[in-house]
């Protein structure tokens, strides 16, 4: 089978199977009837979530509050103490607490920086998208704003790079890094001020450019129907028992195949339908005036390529569905069946026995792709269990302890996954990620430990999200002792103070040397330094950081701490 057609149709089928990767109910008559009914349900659910996302976007646009916190525990501070010759026993956490909002012509962010729950300073960042001007301020340093003209800053950076390049060429030296940076600037769309304006306008008015949920649902159903029209059903095979981890279900296998000529016919119909698809035309024209024209040119080129006569060598794509007696689809697979080999593309399975569940997913050939499999128990809609993620052919026999010379896998313990919340688009769960302690069955425990320094570490992930808020926490433990964590939380619909750019006073142009000298002359560090000391930072360490010297150096004189005092 022609490689282009095999890959394109396999990707199309895999994407559709991915949408239906859930235990679905279907009246079992043929593969196409089963999977088309399942896909229609999946598309309907997707369209509902898509429509709901527009409401969430409005809340996001009005304002969002974010907290990002890095915490070090006692063991983490002790570990870092081996690498850094400074006292960090006083440090507990650092946090950035920000309020962010977007409008068509502006972005606003006001953030507080905290250390050990003590506020150190405030960061203000405003982006005037209409004039492409950025305003920044740290009021604890100085009340005035630094203004950066986006276009002028790009031109200045480009001029510096060009000057460096000319200087190196004169001296006979060539800097590949400088050449790459220049080429990147010239080719980047973000170097074009007009593109920046249009891009930000698109982001802040996203719902206006995107199709309605009903339109999206219609388009997805239209083109998936074309695919199923070209899949040939084979007779259902005898029943097969899926038995994993003591969980078993008896199923009937239904198969659909797509030959080389069928794949070509499918792609031709997709192209021909897309050429006259008014809904696609409306969507693309809403995004960009020239996008639909480019799309039609691409369809024309594809149509010409599809007119090539293909030799049918008997190879085909095979898709299978395992259906239980109560018409649940519990397994799906997709393979490329060549004349001399069968290449796995996708295999998903989920079988249950009362409150027990086994699930697996594999992508690609066994020696090249990845596989994840495991089992757990659902109680009160909460799933707990263990899954193993493997790359390549890395089979591990837990009973015999036999492992290959090199094992690449991660154990995933699911401690509490809310199976009800996810149906409403919310994610709630607690997970831990570990690495195998055995690298080689022939090696001693000491050798295994030496070859796998990560065996004693665990990554702990906690997710708790609702429609208007969310929190993600990632922590690291060693031998069960916490080292530290990163926590990110957000709340939608927060009111953000939005200044009028025309009303901003005491503005200093970053491109004006005299203005910047005036700005620097009025900076005072008193407030920030006092806040750092109040947070618990030792004064000796503070002086060391300021001077770049040692903790034994003398304290800075008053005039260096406060330039205004010197004047």
Regions found by a protein language model. Give the residues of each.
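C-terminal segment of classical bacterial N-terminal signal peptides
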Residues: 18-26
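Bacterial N-terminal signal peptides that target proteins for export
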Residues: 2-11
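Subset-of-secretome marker
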Residues: 27-567
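Hydrophobic helical h-region of N-terminal Sec-dependent signal peptides
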Residues: 13-17
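Cytosolic-facing loops and C-terminal tails of multi-pass membrane proteins
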Residues: 2, 21, 372-374
């Amino acid at each position: 089978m022609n490689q282009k057609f095999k890959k394109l149709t396999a990707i199309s089928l895999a994407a559709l199977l991915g949408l239906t990767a859930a235990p679905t109910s279907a009246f079992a008559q043929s593969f196409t009837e089963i999977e088309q009914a399942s896909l229609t349900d999946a598309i309907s659910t997707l369209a509902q979530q898509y429509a709901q996302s527009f409401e969430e976007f409005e809340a996001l646009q009005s304002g969002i509050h974010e907290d990002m916190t890095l915490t070090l525990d006692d063991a983490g501070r002790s570990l870092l103490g081996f690498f850094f010759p400074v006292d960090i026993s006083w440090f507990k956490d650092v946090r950035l607490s920000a309020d962010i909002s977007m409008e068509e012509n502006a972005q606003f962010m006001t953030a507080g920086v905290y250390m050990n729950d003590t506020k150190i300073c405030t960061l203000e960042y405003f982006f005037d998208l209409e004039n492409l001007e950025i305003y920044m301020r740290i009021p604890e340093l100085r009340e005035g704003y630094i203004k950066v003209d986006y276009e002028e800053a790009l031109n200045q950076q480009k001029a510096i790079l060009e000057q460096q390049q000319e200087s190196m060429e004169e001296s006979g030296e060539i800097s590949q890094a400088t050449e790459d940076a220049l080429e990147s600037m010239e080719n980047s769309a973000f170097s074009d001020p007009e593109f920046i304006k249009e891009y930000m306008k698109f982001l802040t008015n996203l719902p206006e450019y995107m199709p309605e949920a009903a339109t999206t649902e219609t388009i997805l159903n239209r083109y998936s129907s074309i695919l199923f029209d070209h899949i040939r059903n084979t007779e259902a095979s005898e029943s097969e028992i899926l038995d994993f981890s003591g969980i078993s279900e008896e199923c009937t296998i239904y198969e659909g195949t797509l030959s080389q000529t069928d794949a070509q016919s499918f792609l031709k119909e997709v192209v021909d339908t897309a050429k006259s698809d008014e809904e696609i035309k409306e969507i693309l024209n809403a995004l960009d005036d020239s996008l639909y024209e480019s799309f039609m040119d691409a369809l024309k080129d594809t149509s010409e390529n599809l007119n090539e006569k293909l030799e049918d060598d008997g190879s085909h794509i095979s898709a299978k569905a395992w259906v239980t007696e109560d018409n649940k689809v519990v397994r799906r697979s997709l393979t490329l069946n060549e004349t001399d080999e069968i290449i796995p593309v996708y295999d998903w399975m989920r079988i249950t026995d009362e409150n027990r569940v086994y699930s697996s997913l594999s992508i690609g050939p066994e020696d090249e792709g990845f596989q994840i499999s495991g089992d757990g128990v659902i109680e009160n809609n909460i799933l707990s269990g263990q899954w193993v993620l493997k790359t390549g052919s890395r089979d591990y026999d837990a009973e015999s302890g036999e492992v290959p010379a090199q094992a690449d896998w991660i154990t995933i313990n699911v401690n509490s996954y809310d199976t009800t919340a996810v149906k409403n688009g919310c994610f709630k769960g607690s997970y831990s990620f570990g690495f195998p302690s055995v690298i080689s069955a022939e090696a001693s425990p000491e050798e295994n430990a030496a070859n796998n320094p990560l065996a004693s570490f665990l990554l702990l992930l906690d997710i708790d999200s609702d429609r208007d808020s969310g929190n993600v926490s990632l922590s690291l433990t060693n031998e069960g002792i916490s080292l530290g964590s990163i926590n990110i939380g957000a709340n939608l619909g927060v009111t953000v103070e939005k200044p009028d750019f025309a009303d901003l006073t005491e503005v200093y142009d970053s491109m004006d040397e005299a203005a910047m000298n005036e700005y620097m002359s009025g900076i005072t560090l008193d407030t920030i330094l006092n806040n750092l000391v109040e947070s618990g930072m030792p004064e000796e360490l503070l002086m060391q950081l300021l001077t770049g010297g040692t903790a034994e150096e003398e304290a800075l004189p008053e005039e260096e701490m406060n330039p205004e005092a010197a004047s």
